[in-house]
Amino acid sequence: MSGAITCSAADLSALLGPNATAAADYICGQLGSVNNKFTDAAYAIDNTYLLFSAYLVFAMQLGFAMLCAGSVRAKNTMNIMLTNVLDAAAGGLFYYLFGYAFAFGESSDGFIGRHNFGLQNFPTLTSDYSFFLYQWAFAIAAAGITSGSIAERTKFVAYLIYSSFLTGFVYPVVSHWFWSPDGWASPFRSEDRLFGTGAIDFAGSGVVHMVGGIAGLWGALIEGPRIGRFPDGGHAIALRGHSASLVVLGTFLLWFGWYGFNPGSFTKILIPYNSGSNYGQWSGIGRTAVTTTLSGCTAALTTLFGKRLLSGHWNVTDVCNGLLGGFAAITAGCSVVDPWAAIVCGFVASLVLIGCNKLAELLKYDDPLEAAQLHGGCGAWGLIFVGLFAKEKYINEVYGASPGRHYGLFMGGGGKLLGAQLVQIIVIVGWVSATMGTLFFILKKLNLLRISEQHEMRGMDLAGHGGFAYIYHDNDDDSIGVPGSPVPRAPNPPAV
């Protein structure tokens, strides 16, 4: 702990006079005991802070569940809710058995961790159980992103397989590259950093959001669009989610959890900086919460007015997605940029999301939650944003002062950090495409990926989960007249 009390008998003997050695030893011993108690208290506070942050990030699973449920049609609600529970449960076991070791196992090489499988020889000198729990919450967030892209048409066994593979292997390898002190592109390396700086992805615009988004992109591409989304290869038909209320609820829960996702990624709070006695990591944590807030708010408002110009109406679900896109983008640089730069981040993130959605329609790509566009597209912009706007002072505070460490291009730091960020984008796209793309392709060839046309028309709840989620639910247009749909049609809800 910094600021520790130092004491020696030799220092006190001259002041206490003859026969003072024993007294000096006693006094120094007492001061040492007090110093140890302060150190223990600091560890306890840091671990409590990290545990609280882990609880917030885990609460995001409820946000994902509500967002997904509201974004699909009523006949598929039970299925999508079950997949969110599955992400957490299967992810917990596979991250415990393999994922944490691949990501942070000590010691390791630059590509993958090789120790601490099943948390053997744990805790270590640098990591406690609170750190494992926090990282598990991140891993299942990536899997939750993917489930939204392939909603309403995917076999349950495919969810089991992809979720376990993603949280147990694909995601941990990426997190090792950029977050482990041994990772080949990590800014935490003591030497031989990528382009002299390492790729800065503080809380996971690339590691979490791009990984989940690119995995979902391949799943949705290989499966193909839902029945009725692009009838006869023509214009897109909106297959609206059944509950804007659940979408808004999920969005606010995710917003709340993001205050553990981004500020919590400091992992410690009681670290003073050298800039002043009242300025330390606690200040950086507060600034990170502010930049997170401003980026999301700016993206929400930009989406509100941008979609109003394009569609002619105010759409709450579009605004919610814009808000989340702003959060996904700022996640990489939230700790190393000024608040004004976060506004720029959110503004551009909204435009990226709108543009990606337009491109998806042109390419006949169907993603019920816009997960690939939101998390993949906005996550990639977030990495580029760091290479442009990262501030030298904040980088040295967060990642440790290092002579010649590079910072944002627009802040006068040259282009090497931007180069490292572009490398991160390329390798994440390549790695996830090679692993998850191959997995989804194999599942399709084995007829384990997509449900039958009849089950898709009737709804996955009735076909595979014992019945509908609601006693009174809206029969979707494409289920009318299909045998086995016994629930009478209810009035359609008002347009959002």
Curated annotation (Swiss-Prot):
Keyword field contains Membrane: yes
Keywords: Ammonia transport, Membrane, Phosphoprotein, Transmembrane, Transmembrane helix, Transport
Primary location: membrane
One Gene Ontology term of the molecular function aspect: ammonium channel activity
Family: Belongs to the ammonia transporter channel (TC 1.A.11.2) family.
Membrane topology: Multi-pass membrane protein
Segments traversing the membrane: 50-70, 85-105, 131-151, 156-176, 202-222, 246-266, 284-306, 314-334, 336-356, 369-389, 422-442
PROSITE patterns membership: AMMONIUM_TRANSP (PS01219)
Entry's Gene Ontology cellular component terms: membrane
Pfam families noted in UniProt: Ammonium_transp
InterPro entries noted in UniProt: Ammonium/urea_transptr, Ammonium_transpt, Ammonium_transpt_CS, NH4_transpt_AmtB-like_dom
Keyword Zinc: no
Positions of post-translational Phosphoserine modification: S485
Compartments it resides in: Membrane
Reported function: Involved in ammonium transport.
Organism of derivation: Arabidopsis thaliana
Protein name stated in the entry: Putative ammonium transporter 1 member 5
